[in-house]
């Protein structure tokens, strides 16, 4: 039951009245976090998988791995993220600082979405180069073919075309 009482890789708990729901993960997946096997077997938050023969490596779902692995709220500042660019609601970026000048570090926001029946809150990828569509968004089924969600097969409507700054 520890899996259900904690959180899903840093996201809201998947507990249901003290018991694991169908989308809840197994405690053997990612160290002490509640992590679905699919997180380890494919990719998480649109970034490369940490899968090793069906099990997670020590790097999976740790709060310090925002840019190159699974992105958790604890490592991302969502308050600075804008939502005014791109195609489709909730896709955008924000600039660091308040001068209005383009910064070399852009917070690329990804919107709320559902993955394996679990709601993930907004998060940012801090980078001076635009992430690809599927790196930025752990896409919904309406955006990607389910077997490739979070990887490389987003439909164009999911992608952000109008916010690609020059570093």
Swiss-Prot record:
UniProt GO cellular component terms: cytosol; keratin filament
Highest taxon above the source species: Eukaryota
Gene: KRTAP1-3
Subunit structure: Interacts with hair keratins.
Entry function: In the hair cortex, hair keratin intermediate filaments are embedded in an interfilamentous matrix, consisting of hair keratin-associated proteins (KRTAP), which are essential for the formation of a rigid and resistant hair shaft through their extensive disulfide bond cross-linking with abundant cysteine residues of hair keratins. The matrix proteins include the high-sulfur and high-glycine-tyrosine keratins.
Listed result of changing residue 34 to S: In allele KAP1.8B
Keyword check for Repeat: yes
Protein name, as recorded: Keratin-associated protein 1-3
Organism name: Homo sapiens
Transmembrane feature ranges: none
InterPro entries in UniProt: KAP
Entry keyword set: Keratin, Repeat
GO molecular function, one term: structural constituent of skin epidermis
Family: Belongs to the KRTAP type 1 family.
UniProt-reported outcome of changing residue 82 to R: In allele KAP1.8B
Pfam families, per database record: Keratin_B2
Tissue specificity comment: Expressed in the middle/upper portions of the hair cortex, in the region termed the keratogenous zone.
